[in-house]
Swiss-Prot record:
CDD domains reported in the protein's UniProt record: KISc_KIF4, Rcc_KIF21B, WD40
Biased composition (Acidic residues): 579-623
Keywords associated with the record: ATP-binding, Cell projection, Coiled coil, Cytoplasm, Cytoplasmic vesicle, Cytoskeleton, Microtubule, Motor protein, Nucleotide-binding, Phosphoprotein, Repeat, WD repeat
Transmembrane segments: none
Pfam families assigned: KIF21A, KIF21A_2nd, Kinesin, WD40
Species of the source: Rattus norvegicus (Rat)
Main localization of the protein described in the UniProt heading: cytoplasm
Biological process per Gene Ontology, one example term: retrograde dendritic transport
Subcellular location: Cytoplasm, Cytoskeleton; Cell projection, Dendrite; Cell projection, Growth cone; Cell projection, Axon
Protein's name according to its UniProt entry: Kinesin-like protein KIF21B
Length: 1634
């Protein structure tokens, strides 16, 4: 590896093979690799050069060995390393890195990380083994691993087993830090200590399977996050000792050598980075979460590209590198420009479909080659110092050795230099080297000459043989060998003679010098040895040389004698040839036997290898088929048993053979011994018989001795005979064992075959299951995508219908108002109109001190009212929208005038013109590239279509050939069509190639433009010129922004016109169907025709009778007149119900309008359209929306109950509350801008429109509807809203009760309201839905397990949420009020009604659940916040999934409220029993557990009961009877009133459209407060029982009490309240905090 210093980032490019899908769709390969060069050609001639390039057919092993293996070796030397995989999605990054463990891969397909792990542990074992062989202390290694995932800019720990896999959106606690040396490290990450390769692979597999993946259109398993797998290697090894001179170190006394073993510690970290693929959303088809992930991935890669550009661009001299723009670049700070050896592997696709992505990837990788890293060894400071000292000692020792050897000398002047001896020695060494080179050359020349001589002599001998007619190739070869041997012997002879001559000369010199040396030097024998021995040695050498010479001469003579004897020579040659052939055959046979033996051994090795592979495959943990596993286990067990038995038989057979040989040898030995003894006995007896001095005693002794020996030998013989019998028996058993062995071997072979077949079957089954699972996953992803698309269409249609409803309602209001304008006004009403001054706003200035003034009263004519109304409208438009639009014009003119007054210098003007031209060129170039990309994508799609058509035609032709091959005409036509399609495809391919070439040319031009960068012009500007250029840029930006705004306004205007046209056509269709319906009552055929038309057009009615409409249908289509609030009650099933709405609207239209009325209506409609188009302001803005609602809303009284065309009996409760008290003041919040009208004077029918519309009820619906036959008792039980007359003394109260809703049997705990609907929840375990227009209960939502403590209605989705016990029930009231889902406090989602079977009240919650105290909806309607226990759970309503928690309270959360900040983020404020109010500010990504942003202090003295927010002001009410006012921006307490009520403050709300606060207490009192100075305005006894909840809509105030009633209140402005002394005293006690 390289030493310390700069090291460039190396870049490798891998081109993946084409996919089968790409081949089927006809994609061409647009990349090519230059052979032998690391160069990629994109298109025709655009070349990119890198460090390594791998083509389509490159194996994984080649990539690893070429790129990564050296980095692993560098880690052992203490160098950091990084491997970075980059490329578009589906380019093969995960496959290259080897982190895709979802599929089984073979060893050849293993990626970089598994191979690097194996290499790492091989290196560890090798170094330990090498140290053991050398007898030194082995190195110690410690390996640890980390696996991080960067998902949506959040760092997740893939090794953290405690992390919830579904909680990916939660904020992690992992932090990134930088040490003193600039190294990057993380805290809060799990680091696992690794002991073996298998353990590390298992950790890698676990982390890889936990990584976020999903399916897109480009890739079935697409990585949705960046993954960084890090291996930390710590090594402690023995330091290498330097070579010492004479084993001493300078400075040590007496030349003692240093003792002890020194160690050094090296650390290294290896990053394996698998980046997520760069994506184009239009190609991946990602929506929802996938789109969000893709955007986050592209942002991280953009930041990485900026870092690479900053590091690699040498011309700009970039000072700042934006590492902190992304967590990805921060983590890779070491790898890019830091202490690491980095290699980047750019994975690209070869298909022309991915041409732009491939081009961008290659450019991206090309920039990375310019990055220089500063690579140093990671060594501890002690080891570094010891290494430096060792190097210094070695240098000094070398210098000392040179002084001692005389190489270095010190001159007279003290300067160091080299000695003359050293220079002479160097010169002689140089000369010696030259001579050696010359000797070597001459030796080679001699060898060549000898070869030539040998060849020539052999040719000569062959010619002689040819002339004699006895030529043979074998004889010629033999002659050549002999001649070569003769020449070699001749050369050796010459060398021996030369050596002999030199020895003779030396011997003569020694003999001549010997007498003198003996007498002169007594020490001569010590140096020269004995003269006699030297003489003997010399004579011996001479004698041997002579013998060799004579032998060589004789051999030469014999060789020469052989040449004339041709016949003898031929015979000997043939004989030698036959001998050589026999020896060759013997050698061949021996080699063949050896090959057979080696082949057998290889087969045995292969069998054993296959058995091992089968055993390994048996242990595969991926198999999950139980039957296969059981069979495989049994089979493996039997094989092992049989194998053991075979081994035992073989061992016993070997032991038997050994015993056999031993017994046979002993038997032979004993037999020989017996025979020798017998012979000796006979010889001795014979000798005794011949002896003359024979004694009987001696004979007996000898005889006894021999008899004893014979008996012993006989005993031994008997033992041996028994052993021989045993041996015979064993031999018999051996044959039986051999038969059993063969049988068992046969069974084992059969079992192995069965095992192989079973394994093959298992693999096929696994492959089939994998394919089925992949197919199902793809189908599920497609269905999910289709569902998202349908949901998007539904939302678009709902939005369109809401807009249609708004326009229709406004049209109806305009018509009704204009009809009322033509009627006379009573004097009383006209006088009340005059009470309000013209410039009176929504009521903010109403207070106790200003209500005493009275305005003059008098009658006004209708024309004066109309003129006043028009003046107010014009004044409003002039103050707000027109000023907003035109406000920029004076400023812009002033700015232009100021700019024109400034004088531009000629140089600044020229620079500005140059910059402007450059900007225009860049813009035009990019537009051209975008257009070319669009053309190329269009051509690719067209080519795919043509390919599909071509394949269909080919299949059709094949089918036609198979069915009727005689139809040549049809086949010819199909062939012609296929040829035409092929020609079209070729033309499209040529066009695609041209587009690619053009894009490449533009890219080169772009690079040229970038090379002459505008920064050069800007950097050459002076300060004044820079200011002028900045001024011009500002003007140009303003102009461009204005142009864009104008274009957007035109687009919105055209879209509005298009919507209006669609609504007009839809209205005409509905009116036509209404007219046909009236005619169809008597014609069944016409009814059927209308029914079919309705179903074809998608707006069929759900009613059983065409002429009647149900109450549910009406409630879904009808909205209160005069309301333009965004929270209006609008339903999504409007296409089916628009006809009913038109029918009602037609009844409200009355007589035709005159021309003046039509003009006014047209002006009002155009006004609304202008506001909706957003040119002046957005109508969705709360301020302008309120203004518009007060400006263009028309009076509602007198038009609430339109006249009827049919008469019937009085069954509606509205007829019983039609009369009003003449003395009661009739007030409206619209009095400031809406011209009032007198009560209707025309006669009414007994049966009004609402009773007619609600007369038809559908059976089986969950809505508890009433019909015409309902009795009065049933109506009372169902619930009704009854009006209340003015009470005595009510003129002094700030609120006036106008209606009362009754119907619950137990205390009402919660309520929610819109302009048309009221929702209430009670202790009777039910919720009720009321129609505020008809005054009736329209539905009862029952089946709750306990008290209903909270209820909310979402106007965006039309869903109702009710809380009871630990459940949140979700009701869909658009069709029939049914519970569609049940949410639990623990975060579970249950489809349908989970509490349906609950017939009795549930006192306790289920195990693991907590009581839910309150809930709140986000203003956008997408989030639901549920307070359960001491936390608030966040639900995403689009998916009905919990995504996070708000924690921080130590007591139960009793109340919460939600608002939106200026950046459209949710701001949640919670109040708890722990007396604290906490604020949570949420961001874009809401995941995990979120802590409070701020704790409001000081806390209350008791638990918090209610909260209310208006703007930046927060009010909190507590059980301590006090109310506090907080500033959300400054996050501090503004004011507090300790005893605002006598009892608990239970509810807070705001007066609609006025800066006034409403508070209600447990004693039943309602108080009104001024929001600005927090002073009381008035109070009223609202209920006799505790008030539990309060809410408002745009007109009314609703209070729910424990007296089972809901009261509807109106605010009464302009009245002086008679405040009690206690209330007035509160003003003095109000505490204002700094």
């Amino acid at each position: 590896m390289a030493g310390q210093g700069d090291c460039c980032v190396k870049v490798a490019v891998r081109i993946r093979p084409q996919l089968s899908k790409e081949k089927i769709e006809g994609c061409h390969i647009c990349t090519s690799v230059t052979p032998g060069e690391p160069q990629v050609l994109l298109g025709k001639d655009k070349a990119f050069t890198y460090d390594f390039v791998f083509d389509l057919d490159t194996w994984q092993e080649q990539i690893y060995s070429t790129c990564v293996s050296k980095l692993i070796e560098g880690c052992f030397e203490g160098y950091n390393a990084t491997v970075l995989a980059y490329g578009q999605t589906g380019a093969g990054k995960t496959y290259t890195m080897g982190t895709g463990f979802d599929t089984v891969t073979s060893e050849e397909e293993q990626g970089i990380i598994p191979r690097a792990i194996a290499h790492l542990f091989r290196g560890i074992d090798e170094r330990k083994r090498r140290a053991q062989e050398q007898g030194v202390t082995g190195p110690e290694f410690k390996v640890s691993a980390q696996f991080l995932e960067l998902y949506n800019e959040e760092i997740l720990d893939l090794f953290d087993s405690t992390r919830d896999p579904d909680a990916r959106h939660r904020r992690s606690n992992i932090k990134i830090h930088e040490d003193a040396n600039g190294g990057i490290y993380t805290t809060g990450v799990t680091s696992r200590l690794i002991n073996s390769q298998e353990e590390l692979i298992q950790c890698l597999k676990q982390g890889a399977l936990s990584r976020t993946t999903a399916s897109t259109q480009m890739n079935v398993q697409s990585s949705r996050s960046h993954a960084i797998f890090t291996i930390h290697l710590c090594q402690m090894r023995v330091c290498a000792q330097p070579d010492l001179v004479n084993e001493t170190v300078t400075g040590l006394p007496d030349g003692t050598a240093p003792t002890g073993t020194e160690y050094e510690t090296l650390t290294a970290k290896f990053h394996f980075v698998d980046l997520a693929g760069s994506e184009r959303l239009k190609r991946t088809g990602a929506t929802g979460e996938r789109a969000k992930e893709g955007i986050s991935i592209n942002c991280g890669l953009l930041a990485l590209g900026n870092v690479i550009s900053a590091l690699g661009d040498q011309s700009k001299k970039v000072v700042h590198v934006p590492y902190r723009d992304s967590k990805l670049t921060r983590l890779l700070q070491d790898s890019l420009g830091g202490n690491s050896q980095t290699i980047m592997i750019a994975c690209v696709s070869p298909s022309d479909r991915d041409f732009m992505e491939t081009l961008n990837t290659l450019k991206y990788a090309n920039r990375a080659r310019n990055i220089k890293n500063k690579v140093v060894v990671n060594q501890d400071k002690t080891s570094q110092q010891i290494s430096a000292l060792r190097a210094e000692i070695a240098r000094l020792q070398m210098e000392l050795m040179e002084y001692k050897a005389g190489k270095r000398v010190i001159g007279e002047d003290g300067a160091e230099g080299y000695s003359d001896l050293f220079r002479e020695n160097a010169m002689l060494q140089k000369e010696n080297g030259a001579l050696r080179l010359r000797v070597k050359a001459m030796q080679e020349a001699i060898d060549a000459i000898n070869n030539r001589v040998t060849q020539l002599m052999s040719q000569e001998a062959n010619l002689l043989l040819a002339k004699a007619g006895d030529g043979n190739e074998a004889i010629g070869a033999l002659i050549q060998n002999y001649i070569r041997e003769i020449e070699e012997l001749r050369t050796k002879l010459l060398e021996s003679e030369a050596m002999n001559e030199s020895l003779r000369r030396s011997l003569s010199r020694a003999s001549a010098r010997n007498p003198y040396s003996l007498g002169a030097s007594p020490a001569g024998p010590a140096f020269g040895g004995s003269p006699a021995s030297s003489m003997e040695d010399a004579s011996e050498v001479i004698r041997r040389a002579k013998q060799d010479l004579e032998r060589l001469k004789k051999k030469e003579v014999r060789q020469r004698r052989k040449s004339p004897e041709k016949e003898a020579f031929k015979k000997r040659a043939k004989l030698q040839q036959e001998n050589s052939e026999e020896t060759d055959e013997n050698e061949a046979e021996e080699e063949e036997e050896e090959r057979d033996e080696s082949g057998c051994e290889e087969e045995e090795d292969e069998d054993s290898g296959s058995e091992e592979s089968l055993v390994d495959s048996d242990s595969d943990p991926e198999e999950k088929e139980v039957n296969f596993q059981a069979d495989l286990a049994d089979l493996t067990c039997e094989i092992e048993i049989k194998q053991k038995l075979i081994d035992e038989l073989e061992n016993s057979q070997r032991r038997l053979q050994t015993l056999k040989h031993q017994y046979e040898e002993k038997l032979i030995l004993l037999q020989n011994k017996i025979r020798d003894t017998q012979l000796e006995r006979d010889r001795v007896l014979q000798n005794l018989s011949t002896m003359e001095c024979y004694t009987e005693e001696k004979a007996n002794k000898i005889k006894a001795d021999y008899e004893k020996r014979l008996r012993e030998m006989n005993r031994d013989l008997q033992k041996l005979q028994a052993a021989q019998k045993e041996h015979a028996r064993l031999l018999k058993n051996q044959s039986r064992y051999e038969r059993e062995l063969k049988k068992l071997q046969t069974e084992v072979a059969e079992m192995k075959k069965a095992k192989v077949a079973l394994m093959k079957q298992m693999r096929e089954e696994q492959q089939r299951r994998r394919l089925v699972e992949t197919k199902r996953n793809r189908e599920i992803a497609q269905l999910k995508k289709e569902q998202r698309r349908q949901e998007f269409q539904i939302r678009a249609l709902e939005s369109q219908k809401r807009q249609q409803e708004i326009v229709l309602r406004r049209k109806t209001q305009e018509v009704s108002a204009l009809r009322r304008l033509a009627k006379p006004m009573s004097e009383r009403v006209a006088g009340r109109v005059g009470l309000k001054p013209p410039n009176m706003d929504s009521g903010a200035e109403v207070s106790a001190s200003t209500t005493s003034s009275e305005a003059e009263s008098g009658a006004r004519s209708v024309s004066s009212i109309v003129r006043q109304w028009n003046r107010k409208i014009n004044h409003f438009l002039g103050d707000h929208p027109t000023a907003t639009v035109n406000g920029a014009r004076p400023a812009r003119k002033k700015f232009q005038k100021k700019g024109a007054s400034q004088s531009f210098s000629k140089a600044a003007r020229l620079k500005w013109q140059s910059l402007e031209r450059r900007i225009i060129d860049i813009v035009m170039q990019r537009m051209t590239i975008v257009n070319l990309e669009a053309d190329m994508e269009r051509l690719i799609k067209k080519r795919e279509e043509l390919f599909l058509l071509q394949e269909a035609l080919r299949r059709k032709r094949e089918r036609l050939q198979a069915e009727s091959p005689e139809e040549e005409k049809g086949l010819q036509e199909l062939a012609e069509e296929i040829e035409v399609l092929a020609a079209n495809i070729d033309y499209i391919n040529d066009s695609i190639t041209d587009c690619q070439a053009t894009i490449m040319q533009l890219e080169e031009t772009k690079e040229e433009l970038d090379s002459t960068d505008t920064s050069v012009v800007i950097s050459s500007c002076s300060l004044a010129e820079a200011r002028l250029l900045l001024d011009n840029f500002l003007k140009a930006s303003i102009d461009k922004g204005l142009q864009v705004a104008q274009k957007e306004a035109q687009i919105r205007l055209l879209e509005g016109r298009l919507r209006q046209t669609d609504m007009t056509g839809s209205s005409q269709n509905h009116l036509l169907l209404d007219a046909l319906r009236e005619k169809a009552e008597a014609h069944p055929e016409l009814q059927a025709l209308i029914y079919n038309v309705q179903h074809e057009n998608g707006y069929a009615s759900t009613d059983e009778e065409v002429s009647e409409f149900s109450e549910g249908s009406f409630s879904q289509s009808f909205t209160m007149k005069g309301s333009t609030s965004h929270d209006d009650f609008k339903f999504k099933g409007e296409p089916k119900l628009s006809a009913q709405m038109k029918a009602v609207s037609a009844e409200c239209l009355g007589p035709p309008l005159d021309s003046s009325t039509k003009n006014i209506t047209k002006s009002l409609a155009s006004l609304v359209e202008i506001k909706e188009d957003g040119v002046g302001f957005s109508i969705r803005d709360p301020y302008y929306r309120d203004k518009v609602s007060r400006t263009v809303s028309l009076p509602t009284r007198g038009s609430t109950f339109p006249r009827q065309s049919r008469g019937a009996t009085d069954t509606s409760p509205l007829t019983r509350r039609k009369s009003y008290d003449r003395g009661q003041p009739i007030r409206s919040t619209d009095i400031g801008f809406t011209p009032p009208s007198s009560p209707p004077t025309r006669p009414r029918n007994d049966r009004n429109v609402f009773s007619r519309l609600t007369s038809n009820q559908s059976q089986g619906s969950a809505l508890d509807k009433s019909d015409d036959s309902d009795s009065s008792l049933s109506e009372v039980l169902r619930g009704i809203i009854t009006p209340i007359g003015g009470a005595k003394g009510a003129r002094t109260a700030p609120l006036q009760c106008v209606s009362m809703a009754e119907g619950h049997t137990k205390p009402i705990l919660c309520l929610d309201a819109t302009d048309e609907l009221l929702f209430t929840g009670s202790k009777d375990r039910s919720c009720k839905m009321w129609n505020l227009v008809t005054g009736q209960e329209i539905a009862a939502l029952k089946g709750h397990p306990n008290n209903v403590v909270s209820i909310k209605y979402c106007s965006h989705s039309g869903l109702v949420f009710s809380v009871s016990s630990s459940y949140v029930k979700v009701w869909d009231i658009r069709d029939s009020a049914k519970c569609i889902r049940t949410l639990t406090s623990s975060g579970q989602v249950i489809s349908g009604d989970a509490c349906m079977a609950t017939s009795t009240r549930a006192i306790t919650s289920s195990q693991g659940e907590h009581q839910i105290n309150q809930m709140a909806l986000s203003p956008s309607g997408t989030m639901l916040y549920v307070a359960s226990g001491n936390a608030v759970r966040i639900w995403e309503l689009n998916r009905f999934q919990p995504i996070g928690k708000l924690t921080g309270h130590i007591g139960p959360v009793m109340c919460l409220t939600v608002t939106q900040t200026s950046n459209q983020h949710d701001l949640v404020v919670t109040g708890s029993k722990d007396h604290y109010v906490k604020m949570f500010q949420l961001g874009d990504c809401v995941t995990g557990t979120i802590g409070p942003t701020h704790n409001f202090e000081p806390p209350h003295y008791d638990g918090i009961e209610c909260l209310a927010i208006q703007g930046d002001i927060l009010f909190s009410g507590s059980r301590d009877n006090g109310i506090k006012k907080w500033d959300l921006d400054q996050q501090e307490l503004i004011q507090q009133i300790p005893n605002a009520h006598k009892d608990w403050v239970c509810a807070l709300a705001f007066v609609p459209g006025r800066p006034m606060l409403l508070s209600a207490c447990r004693a039943g009192f309602i108080k009104v407060w001024n929001v600005d100075n927090f002073t009381p305005i008035g109070e009223i006894k609202g209920h006799d029982s505790p008030i539990n909840a309060i809410c408002t809509n745009s007109k009314h105030i609703f209070t729910a009490s424990s007296d089972c009633r809901v009261k509807l209140w109106n605010y009464v402005p302009g009245l002086t309240p008679c405040l009690p002394r206690r209330v007035l005293a509160i003003k003095g006690r109000a505490t204002t905090l700094p």
